[in-house]
Every structure is written in structure tokens, then in C-alpha cells.
């Protein structure tokens, strides 16, 4: 009788539902590597203003799946000039907060809206004042500061690996090349604890 009861409890436990791993718990951390396009789709043409970006970040999760984010990014866009283009590169560090506004019960797919503050340096034409046709640039570099708003998603492929996608609008001041940049891209997040 006792064996039969244990067998029934075991069968019920296995058939009632599936147990999911615990994700996005407070104090969990993840390292993210991300790449994407900035200000449109970069096609390598000299007439295109679009560019690309790459970044490395650390996420620290809080209650409800929200997260604090810290990271560094390199973004390069181009300013068309006659038959060439002027590269504009921004190297920034940022920190921010992202709120989990939608997720499934198993925390496999999560959506975030977030904001961050950033500061860094912008370089025009890699610091060279003179262009190939003899024209002179007024500014070749500047310290920049600002922030961003973003919409992100995380799709967990396993307990320790997630695919990420994001759309971000950066707004920076301190430069003379434009204050707003739109970024969209993908990344991989590795949960480290």
C-alpha cells in the first residue's frame, strides 16, 4: 500500500507540470556582447550616413526581472563629403536601468524598456584636421555626454545563454556632429552566476 501511494505521488508530480529553471533572480549577473547598425543599414557606400556599433555590457538583475546595466560601446557613423565620407566615432561608457514590462511564466522571453546615462569621447576623421582635398575641419574631437532610451528583448536558449535584440535612441551633447543616433542590433548574453 505504501509503495503504491509513493508511485502515485511520483506519477502525479511528473505529469502535473514541468519545472522551469529559475531565471532573472536578484543578484544574478550576465555578460552581453552586442553588435548592430546605427542610423540606418550600413552598406559601405561613401554616400551613406549609416554606421555600425559594438558593445560589451554587464547586467545585474533585481526583483521582478528588472536589471541594472553597465557597459561600453563603440559606434561609428559616416558623414558624406564630396566623393568620400568622414568617419565619426563615439566611444562611450554607460549605466542604466531596464524595467521588465512583459514576460512569459517560465521567463524564457522577456521584454524591457530602459534608460541610461552615458559619457565618452567623439572623434571626427580620426583627429586629422585636413581633408584629402585640403579643406580643414573645425572640430576633430570632443567629450560627449547624454543618455539613451531603449526597447530590448531577451530570449533564453538555455539557462546560461540568451539571444538579445534591441532598439536604442542615443542623445548626446558636447559635439557638433549631431545629437541623435538610432541603433538596432542583436547580441548574446552569458549568465555568469
Regions of interest found by a model, annotated:
Residues 30, 67-69, 110-112, 156, ...:
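Membrane-spanning beta-strand positions in outer-membrane beta-barrel proteins
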Residues 41-44, 79-86, 133-139, 171-175:
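Extracellular loop and loop/strand-boundary signature of outer-membrane beta-barrel proteins
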Residues 1-28, 193:
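Cleavable N-terminal export/targeting peptides
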Residues 27-31, 48-54, 85-93, 109, ...:
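Residues that define the transmembrane beta-barrel architecture of outer-membrane proteins
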Residues 75-77, 147-193:
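Predominantly the C-terminal beta-signal and adjacent terminal strand-loop region
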Residues 57-132, 190-193:
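Gram-negative (and chloroplast) outer-membrane scaffold detector with strong preference
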Residues 23-50, 101, 105, 115, ...:
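Outer-membrane pore/translocation modules
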Residues 20-71, 75, 185, 189-193:
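Short glycine/proline- and aromatic-enriched beta-strand/turn motifs that initiate or cap beta-hairpins
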Amino acid at each position: 500500500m505504501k509503495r503504491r501511494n509513493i508511485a502515485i505521488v511520483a506519477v502525479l508530480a511528473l505529469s502535473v507540470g514541468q519545472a522551469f529553471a529559475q531565471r532573472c533572480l536578484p543578484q544574478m549577473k550576465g555578460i552581453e556582447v552586442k553588435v548592430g547598425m546605427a542610423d540606418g543599414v550600413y552598406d559601405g557606400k561613401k554616400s551613406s550616413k549609416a554606421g555600425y556599433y559594438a558593445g560589451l555590457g554587464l547586467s545585474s538583475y533585481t526583483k521582478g526581472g528588472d536589471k541594472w546595466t553597465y557597459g561600453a560601446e563603440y559606434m561609428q557613423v559616416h558623414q558624406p563629403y564630396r566623393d568620400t565620407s568622414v568617419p565619426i566615432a563615439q566611444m562611450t561608457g554607460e549605466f542604466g536601468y531596464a524595467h521588465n514590462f512583459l514576460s512569459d511564466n517560465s521567463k524564457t522571453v522577456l521584454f524591457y524598456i530602459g534608460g541610461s546615462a552615458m559619457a565618452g569621447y567623439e572623434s571626427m576623421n580620426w583627429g586629422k584636421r585636413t581633408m584629402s582635398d585640403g579643406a580643414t575641419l573645425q572640430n576633430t574631437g570632443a567629450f560627449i555626454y547624454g543618455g539613451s532610451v531603449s526597447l530590448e528583448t531577451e530570449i533564453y536558449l538555455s539557462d546560461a545563454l540568451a539571444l538579445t535584440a534591441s532598439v536604442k535612441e542615443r542623445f548626446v551633447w558636447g559635439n557638433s556632429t549631431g545629437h541623435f543616433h538610432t541603433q538596432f542590433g542583436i547580441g548574446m548574453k552569458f549568465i555568469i552566476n
